[in-house]
């Protein structure tokens, strides 16, 4: 038996359909060599190791696919989206299973949309656009058809994919590839980025899994919160990436500004987030910035309400004059 996944992976596509341990079995009538080992270097860190050609972009061989996917190395280096590598590999080296040998499984539309949302602004900045060949519109929606997404992959025993320096499966998640673009905590940045949460926290642990890093922090103070509840205790900050950006050091105390995943009630520490060594002065600044931001929001709301009221007044005055006449 030749498995098309790493570590007994299970794929959970639309509805309640669960494909049992994605393995290529030798069955009567099955075409020989329908699945082949993934040989695309960028995709060897992902949790499947069997693919099928031609892929979704009509490359007949992996050699052709390697040449084509290499154009995205620069974009991947910006860490513009934690979903970009998964999406690209699902297109260029689609997962192959015994159940779906006749047609490679496509990535879900939502995965494409998240990757595009994060990375298209960078492409536009350099006068490029999101490739038509990677259009999201034609991809299947999770609850209406079979598709693959990071959330739909679990191990057979429920464990994550451990990162092991001696394990070639995790190449590409190496920290030496990580280049974090520093983001300074300024009022302009705070207003522009509209962070969901701001906390004072001490870093307790950095957990490194294959293609995923999580920071475990002890929350000391909550300066701003949104929809996800933040307890005054140890919480996880999820990167959904093999890189920890911004970088954190264990036992250091930071002011952290980031975003949230409302659907899964997670706090995110992703590209564009801020982590600066805690200083009381900085904490006071952030509180002032937040008050200004709230005040600006209230003024905008009051102004639009006032404009609406003013637009109604002439009508009422006109009616009253007509009544007097």
Curated annotation (Swiss-Prot):
Biased composition (Low complexity): 300-312
UniProt signal peptide: 1-32
Disordered: annotated segments: 299-325
Pfam families registered for this protein in UniProt: Fz, NTR
Gene Ontology terms describing biological process: canonical Wnt signaling pathway; cochlea morphogenesis; convergent extension involved in organogenesis; epithelial cell development; hepatocyte differentiation; negative regulation of canonical Wnt signaling pathway; negative regulation of cartilage development; negative regulation of cell development
Keywords linked to the UniProt accession: Developmental protein, Differentiation, Disulfide bond, Glycoprotein, Secreted, Signal, Wnt signaling pathway
Disulphide-bridged cysteine pairs: 35-96, 43-89, 80-119, 108-147, 112-136
Annotated ranges, domain NTR: 178-298
Primary location class: secreted
PROSITE patterns membership: FZ, NTR
Gene Ontology MF term list: Wnt-protein binding
GO cellular component: cytoplasm; extracellular space
Location(s) in or outside the cell: Secreted
Database matches in CDD domains: CRD_SFRP3, NTR_Sfrp3_like
SMART domains reported for this sequence: C345C (SM00643), FRI (SM00063)
Subunit structure: Interacts with MYOC.
Domain notes: The FZ domain is involved in binding with Wnt ligands.
Role summary: Soluble frizzled-related proteins (sFRPS) function as modulators of Wnt signaling through direct interaction with Wnts. They have a role in regulating cell growth and differentiation in specific cell types. SFRP3/FRZB appears to be involved in limb skeletogenesis. Antagonist of Wnt8 signaling. Regulates chondrocyte maturation and long bone development.
Name of the protein this chain belongs to: Secreted frizzled-related protein 3
Gene that this sequence comes from: FRZB
């Amino acid at each position: 038996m030749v498995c098309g996944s790493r570590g007994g992976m299970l794929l959970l596509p639309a509805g309640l359909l669960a494909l049992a341990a994605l393995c290529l079995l030798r069955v009567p009538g099955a075409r020989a060599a329908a699945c082949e080992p993934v040989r695309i270097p960028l995709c060897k860190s992902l949790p499947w190791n069997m693919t099928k050609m031609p892929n979704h972009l009509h490359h007949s061989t992996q050699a052709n696919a390697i040449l084509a996917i290499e154009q995205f190395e620069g974009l991947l280096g910006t860490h513009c989206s934690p979903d970009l590598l998964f999406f690209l590999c699902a297109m260029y080296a689609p997962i192959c299973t015994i159940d779906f040998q006749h047609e490679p499984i496509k990535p879900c539309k939502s995965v494409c949309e998240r990757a595009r949302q994060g990375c298209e602004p960078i492409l536009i900045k350099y006068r490029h656009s999101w490739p038509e060949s990677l259009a999201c519109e034609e991809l299947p929606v999770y609850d209406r058809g079979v598709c693959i997404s990071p959330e739909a992959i679990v191990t057979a025993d429920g464990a994550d994919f451990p990162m092991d320096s001696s394990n070639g499966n995790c190449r590409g998640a190496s920290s030496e590839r990580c280049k974090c673009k520093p983001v300074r905590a300024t009022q302009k940045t705070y207003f522009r980025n509209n962070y969901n949460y701001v906390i004072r926290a001490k870093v307790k642990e950095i957990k490194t899994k294959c293609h995923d890093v999580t920071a475990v922090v002890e929350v000391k103070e909550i300066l701003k919160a949104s929809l996800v509840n933040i307890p005054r205790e140890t919480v996880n900050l999820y990167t959904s990436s093999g890189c920890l950006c911004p970088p954190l050091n264990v036992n250091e105390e930071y002011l952290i500004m980031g975003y949230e995943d409302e659907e899964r009630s997670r706090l995110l520490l992703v590209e564009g987030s801020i982590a600066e060594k805690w200083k009381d002065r900085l904490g006071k600044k952030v509180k002032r910035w937040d008050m200004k931001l709230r005040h600006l929001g209230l003024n905008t709301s009051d102004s639009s309400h006032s404009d609406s009221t003013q637009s109604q007044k002439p009508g009422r005055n006109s009616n009253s004059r007509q009544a007097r006449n």
